[in-house]
Swiss-Prot record:
Catalyzes the GTP-dependent ribosomal translocation step during translation elongation. During this step, the ribosome changes from the pre-translocational (PRE) to the post-translocational (POST) state as the newly formed A-site-bound peptidyl-tRNA and P-site-bound deacylated tRNA move to the P and E sites, respectively. Catalyzes the coordinated movement of the two tRNA molecules, the mRNA and conformational changes in the ribosome. CDD domains: EF-G, EFG_III, EFG_mtEFG1_IV, EFG_mtEFG_C, EFG_mtEFG_II. It holds the Pfam family EFG_III. Belongs to the TRAFAC class translation factor GTPase superfamily. Classic translation factor GTPase family. EF-G/EF-2 subfamily. One of its GO terms (molecular function) is GTP binding. It comes from Limosilactobacillus reuteri (strain DSM 20016) (Lactobacillus reuteri). GO terms for biological process: ribosome disassembly. This is Elongation factor G. It comes from the Bacteria. Keywords: Cytoplasm, Elongation factor, GTP-binding, Nucleotide-binding, Protein biosynthesis. GO terms for cellular component: cytoplasm. NCBIfam families: EF-G, PRK12740.1-3, PRK12740.1-5, PRK13351.1-1, small_GTP. GTP binds at residues 19-26, 83-87, 137-140.
Amino acid sequence: MANKREYPLAKTRNIGIMAHIDAGKTTATERILYYTGKIHKIGETHDGASQMDWMDEEKERGITITSAATTAVWKDNRINIIDTPGHVDFTVEVERALRVLDGAVTVLDAQAGVEPQTETVWRQADQFNVPRIVFANKMDKIGANFDYSVQTIKDRLNVTPLPIQMPIGAEDDFIGLVDLVKMVAYVYDEDKLGTNWDTVEIPDDMKEEAQKRHDEMVETLADIDDNLMEKYLEGEEISVDEIKAAIRKGTLEEQIFPVLAGSAYKDKGIQMMLDAVIDYLPSPIDVKPFVAHDADGNEIELTAGDDKPFAALAFKIATDPFVGRLTFLRVYTGSLQSGSYVLNATKDKRERIGRLLQMHSNQQQEIPEVFSGDIAAAIGLKNTTTGDSLTDPDHPLQLESMDFPEPVIQVSVEPKSKADQDKMDKGLQKLAEEDPTFKAETNPETGETLIAGMGELHLDIIVERLRREFHAEVTVGKPQVSYREAFTKTASAQGKFVRQSGGKGQYGDVWIEFTPLKEGEGFEFEDAIVGGVVPREFIPAVEQGLKEAMQNGVLAGYPLVDMHAKLYDGSYHEVDSSEAAFKVAASLALKNAAKKADPVILEPIMKVDIVVPQDNMGDVMGQVTARRGTIDGMEERGNAQLIHSFVPLSEMFGYATALRSATQGRGTFTMTFDHYSAVPKSVQEDIIKKNGGNN
């Protein structure tokens, strides 16, 4: 018999907690779990005891690396929380989480307001149309300023913040909050770990300001809600319920972003933030329909409901030391019992779900069934990877899959002993399954293993995990940039391979036109053969031969990218032609065309945002230019400056140290991959020389 769902869809929230690194996001999540009864002792990030940061590396570094999923209950509502990393090397984890969330809480440091990485995650959330509320955290910190934080939301994110609270006091005198919706004050009892507070009248010296802010809030809401506008203009009384309904409507439409205040570390404001999650963030039935395609390629809109065929997205793979491979699922429609079969529509393979688990950070509770709107983990899926669609075998649906950026930085890793080799290979395979932006490959010529990822921290953590989880001792080489190669001109060339030396000969002959494509367009192959001059059965071999040759490039051994190849002529031999001969012919055509196609080496260009004190501006801009960077604009940030720049990744190694010394440790920067661009001629010559050329 089917199980009943425990919490109705309308009382389910799937939320993410997102922030700049060090804004206090993990501590805020901890407090949520504490107040919703999920943990009995509070863990602080800075003493390595936090519940959500469950990998050893996270405990050591005090940053959140993988999005742990956990579930909590607040006032008869189920809240599934995904904790997301704030470090730029892990933006993919953030995108992966945003993809399956319905709403998010953005945590700010109330002293700094919106920081560069906040802007990055905010833009990612915009991309996925995720409604958000904002929690101005660390109100107890020296320099904390709620109004400044609200202003930075307006100025830096270009959206309409809606403060629905105001703090009572700040820094050491932060004792509570004024609720601008209900027009009451909450004053905390310092001794009770935030579990006790008194609801009192607004303090006399704050009444006038609170009324002014309440009126401003209602005015903002009236602009986006016609019912409220009418009442407001008529001067009629507007009830608390009407205000809350208008805030909810505006938040779901992303017209406004409610802002709350608090201090997670000092246990203040978390329960009110949880109330706001329930009151203002969407349930699975409030979000826009999700787009999928049926077996015939027709577009279908999916809305949440248990009575529909099962459809879910696998959004993360993790390896658990006790139960093995876990596949995290977001269920969009239908329900699924443990032990049943699903169709992996992406790979067209049937898979059996062994057990279903509800995750609490890294502890699991087994559950018999999952329902529409749930986030859970499954054991037993062997062929499923991140971004795959899992559906009812009788109703195959393809959900929109996830795009992941290519890694931009690589290092060589070498096992210290023969025993370490096997452990390393096994570990790298598992880690690559978990993380689509991490790749491991062996150079066929040198036998060297290269691992590639999104940044130095990303690769540091991979190496740490190899040592810790897979007990593989490895030596790590210097970081190298993942260069690419590309043609800049259209060129045609013949590739002819003839070998006669006793026994069966070899014969393959092709003419191919190569045309450069725009960045990111990949490789396209066009068969323009007329009259069978190259027989049909050899054409796939030509394409394969090109793909293999492109992997090794034409200048310095880097992959050749973004090219259209048109096979338009050639010849064959009745007896001597073979797939192998045509593969070689294709690679010769590529090599010959390269001489006329002006090939270039492309390097990853990073978007680097640097926050520096005014006095260090000149030095830091000089550093950017010296590193072949370009300045793309500046903004004032209080008494600091934010410099937007683009710098080649190859020039960014060791930059953290250089910036620290130029700014006495006060400068910070964030770096994300932006695009590939041709290297200057002199740099290209150096790279070719260093790699011993490829021709």
